[in-house]
């Protein structure tokens, strides 16, 4: 199982200038992937900006949105943005897609909460068309690749989209026992869709190996509008033992990659996590 690390782009009032340095240190430490968390109505750094900054500060580490709230965007515009980030990174981006559930995230006229599932279904075809240079006025340079997509969400529709359009599934930042049914559903849907091989499975867990009190406050703030079943069960690893327990739990589930998401923007957290996980990276 690979070990990745998140960017602190959605830590409340993040020092945004730290993102490129965080990305460079993560690559130097040997992590497999840099991931972002996506929200609009929150005082953080948008995932597309964070991913672009990380792309410019690194050369080899993978990049992942985990997850970007795709229905909040006009489809063609998002497809162009994603193609651009993937291009400047040298083809290192994977687009992780979520559908969103908070009314305040949906601010673009015509892109409200209602109807977001149907919009996303249509937009997925738009992404493919844009990346393929379809039409008399292509929106992306020739040679743009089809950016691989992963999907988050536990609803049946999300799992079905993953099986039709994606390369794998991203679980929520909950205990392994709570996310296991969704991972199993993703694998089952993949087989039922007649897909070859197996879906890539990615798990998330928050961590804070420095200021645990601030980290807990940040997570409570971020999830204050989430359902209690989520807000009360978000995983926050604050000790080496908890990090190792999460690794063991997800290894047992057969997960391909576990990404530890920072709950603070303390740059030293990169080294602290690497000191624990280095033998597995």
Regions found by a protein language model. Give the residues of each.
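Active-site-adjacent structural elements that line small-molecule/cofactor binding pockets in enzymes
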Residues: 1-281
């Amino acid at each position: 199982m690979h070990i990745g690390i998140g960017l602190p782009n959605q830590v409340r009032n993040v020092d945004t200038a730290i993102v490129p340095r965080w990305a460079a240190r993560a690559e130097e430490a040997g992590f497999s992937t840099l991931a972002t968390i996506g929200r609009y109505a929150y005082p953080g750094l948008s995932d597309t900006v964070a991913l672009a900054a990380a792309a410019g500060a690194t050369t080899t580490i993978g990049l992942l949105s985990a997850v970007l709230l795709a229905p909040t965007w006009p489809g063609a515009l998002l497809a162009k943005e994603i193609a651009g980030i993937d291009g400047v990174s040298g083809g290192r981006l994977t687009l992780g897609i979520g559908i969103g559930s908070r009314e305040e995230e949906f601010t673009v006229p015509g892109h409200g909460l209602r109807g977001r599932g149907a919009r996303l279904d249509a937009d997925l075809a738009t992404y493919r068309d844009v990346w393929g240079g379809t039409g008399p006025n292509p929106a992306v340079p020739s040679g743009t690749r089809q950016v691989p997509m992963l999907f988050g969400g536990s609803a049946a529709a999300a799992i079905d989209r993953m099986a039709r359009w994606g390369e794998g599934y991203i679980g929520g930042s909950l205990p392994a026992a709570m996310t296991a049914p969704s991972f199993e559903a993703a694998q089952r849907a993949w087989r039922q869709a007649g897909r070859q091989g197996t879906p890539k499975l990615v798990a998330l867990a928050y961590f804070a190996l420095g200021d645990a009190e601030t980290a807990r406050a940040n997570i409570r703030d971020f999830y204050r509008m989430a359902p209690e079943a989520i807000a009360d069960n978000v995983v926050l690893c604050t000790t080496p033992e908890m990090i190792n327990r999460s690794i063991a739990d997800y290894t047992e589930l057969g997960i391909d990659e576990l990404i530890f998401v920072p709950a603070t923007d303390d740059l030293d957290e990169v080294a602290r996590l690497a000191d624990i996980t280095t033998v597995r990276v």
